[in-house]
Amino acid sequence: MLERKIRLNAVADVKEFVRAAEKCEYDVDVFYNRVVVDAKSILGVMSLDLTKTLTVKYCKEDEEILEGTL
């Protein structure tokens, strides 16, 4: 699993990120403090505090798909 820090500053950023995550074959998770949500869920991602830096964990195989949005 790879880990990356991201900032999603606008709703458009969230939409773009979730669309990219949906294309991934494996699980993509977003972490903030003790909260973990599925990155393929727009409601889950929107429920996080988007003013903070989030941590994304994903498989090496999906790196190419996500790289453009991270």
Model-derived regions: residue spans:
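C-terminal structural segments of small proteins and small subunits
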Residues: 46-70
